Amino acid sequence: MALLWALAVLSHLPLLDAQSPECANLMTVAPITNATMDLLSGKWFYIGSAFRNPEYNKSARAIQAAFFYLEPRHAEDKLITREYQTIEDKCVYNCSFIKIYRQNGTLSKVESDREHFVDLLLSKHFRTFMLAASWNGTKNVGVSFYADKPEVTQEQKKEFLDVIKCIGIQESEIIYTDEKKDACGPLEKQHEEERKKETEAS
């Protein structure tokens, strides 16, 4: 899945290590509170990503479009995820969860008996966020970008591009999704109708 995949990919990269005050400001990782989790609640779209590793880029190119829902569970320090991803013109659905490490400002998921960690970067625009790894000169740096709408404003995009520049990746290396290629609309609608019926019955 786009979100869970990015968590796994980015977790293989070194953690944040700012090289300049400007980049440090952009890449500040803050503790995660209940308010932070509430900000992440709702529907999000996977906008794009950039990775130096060719294998990761190949995987990113396979994702034509993706969106997901996050549901906070404060007491459990986790986010329930419902993710819809379009690959080869087909919809792939997955339900899982992401663990929250509040003090470190990190997210994690367990895959193949291994826990994968990434840093959460909340945007100053609030309705976008990024998952990021290091820009410390390794060949595997990377960032993924998410927004609450399938299209972002120029200001939101600029913040993403500034982070990309900080980690030493060219703008031409960014791989964007295309919401017009989404094939998950019908399944999402079906799930919404099922949840509505369950709510009415309870």
From Swiss-Prot:
The keyword Transport applies. The lineage of its organism: Eukaryota, Metazoa, Chordata, Craniata, Vertebrata. Contains a beta-barrel that binds various ligands in its interior. GO terms for cellular component: extracellular space. Its main location: secreted. Gene3D superfamilies: 2.40.128.20. It is found in: Secreted. One of its GO terms (biological process) is regulation of immune system process. This is Alpha-1-acid glycoprotein. Glycans are attached at N34, N57, N94, N104, N136. Residues 1-18 form the signal peptide. It comes from Bos taurus (Bovine). Pfam families: Lipocalin. InterPro entries: A1A_glycop, Calycin, Lipocln_cytosolic_FA-bd_dom. Disulfide bonds join C91-C184. Functions as a transport protein in the blood stream. Binds various ligands in the interior of its beta-barrel domain. Appears to function in modulating the activity of the immune system during the acute-phase reaction. CDD domains: lipocalin_AGP-like.
